[in-house]
């Protein structure tokens, strides 16, 4: 059995991805937001929560640490303060803990695609170099969720770092996607109906590579664009900005405009219907949108962890 510590644990996607591949024991997490913690407890029971990462003195021995630190200062929607911003600078707490704790064999990071843009790539490279000095060999890749079988075009950077080896992790090749958003949806419910649809007649030809925008709704801003369910889903966001589509976007269904239900938001992020029901029983619909918008795509991370197992890294 391998052991896992989840820093910035969220709802526990990292733990579930390992459970999907290994016999694993999560020996502790660090999470201070009560919203994802409610979902975590509902899914896995009461965790050993170390609490605020800035107050952790050291961590116990573990095979794996995950540290998908806050993207707030890296995101396009944020203030673009980078690794020195109030929230994203918490990555340096991971460095501090690596210096005073038994080092894990594997480190896993996920963050927004913006982390490797022209502005932030020097800071990201500095972090990779820091891990190298600590004995880690790192490999990173920018991945859209649908490339690994996910329901959306959510694009994120993933990095695997391995201790005391020259062997690099090889990210799995893209799969042949055979599903579109429609395949993840539940039967239509009127409570998620927004308005009548007067846009162009959508094609039912499936697009496995991208979302298919049909037209704008109202001002056409984020959350006010209508998409075909026969393409890939758009990226879920933690805040809908009060727009009609909230966290999950708007979709044409049965000649009307609908938003995703809380159950559907969980499913398009890789959770089973049974798990989605557990999450939704613990959270309000708004909290589900917040947590799924902040979450890691479970389908993608399960595939990445499977690669760790197949390459005999753990």
Segments predicted by a language model, with ranges:
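Short connector loops/turns at beta-strand edges and beta->alpha or beta->beta junctions
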Residues: 70-72, 273-274
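C-terminal target-recognition/interaction regions appended to catalytic cores
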Residues: 199-314
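Short, glycine/charged-enriched secondary-structure capping and boundary segments
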Residues: 19-23, 42-45, 78-83, 121-124, ...
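Gly/Ser/Thr-rich beta-alpha loop segments that engage phosphate groups in nucleotides
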Residues: 12-14, 70, 80, 151, ...
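Short, well-ordered alpha-helices that flank and scaffold nucleotide-derived cofactor binding pockets
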Residues: 16-20, 42, 96-99, 129, ...
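SAM cofactor-binding core of SAM-dependent methyltransferases
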Residues: 2-55
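Class I S-adenosyl-L-methionine
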Residues: 55-64, 71-235, 239-242, 255-258
């Amino acid at each position: 059995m391998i052991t896992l510590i989840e820093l910035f644990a969220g709802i526990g996607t990292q733990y579930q991805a390992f459970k999907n591949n290994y016999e694993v024991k999560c020996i502790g997490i660090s999470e201070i937001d009560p919203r994802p913690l409610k979902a975590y407890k509902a899914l896995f029971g009461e965790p050993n929560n170390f609490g605020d990462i800035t107050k952790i003195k050291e961590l116990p021995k573990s095979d794996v640490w995950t540290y998908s630190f806050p993207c707030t200062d890296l995101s396009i929607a944020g203030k673009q303060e980078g690794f020195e911003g109030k929230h994203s600078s918490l990555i340096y707490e991971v460095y501090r803990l690596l210096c005073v704790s038994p080092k894990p064999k594997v480190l896993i990071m996920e963050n927004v695609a913006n982390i490797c843009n022209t502005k932030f790539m020097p800071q990201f490279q500095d972090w990779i170099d820091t891990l190298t000095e600590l004995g880690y060999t790192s490999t990173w890749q920018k991945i859209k969720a649908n490339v690994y079988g996910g329901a959306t075009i959510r694009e994120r950077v993933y990095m695997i770092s391995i201790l005391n080896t020259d062997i690099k992790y090889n990210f799995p090749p893209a799969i042949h996607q055979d599903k579109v958003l429609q395949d993840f949806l539940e039967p239509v419910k009127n409570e998620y109906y927004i308005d009548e649809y007067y846009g162009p007649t959508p094609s039912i030809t499936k697009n496995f590579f991208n979302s298919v925008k049909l037209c704008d709704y109202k001002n056409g801003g984020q959350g006010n664009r209508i998409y075909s369910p026969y393409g890939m889903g758009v990226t879920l966001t933690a805040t809908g900005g009060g727009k009609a589509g909230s966290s999950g976007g708007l979709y044409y269904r049965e000649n009307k405009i609908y938003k995703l239900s809380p159950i559907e938001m969980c499913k398009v992020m890789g959770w089973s219907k049974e798990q989605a029901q557990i999450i939704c029983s613990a959270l309000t619909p708004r909290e589900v949108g917040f947590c799924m918008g902040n979450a890691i795509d479970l389908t993608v991370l399960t595939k990445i962890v499977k690669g760790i197992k197949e390459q005999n890294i753990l």
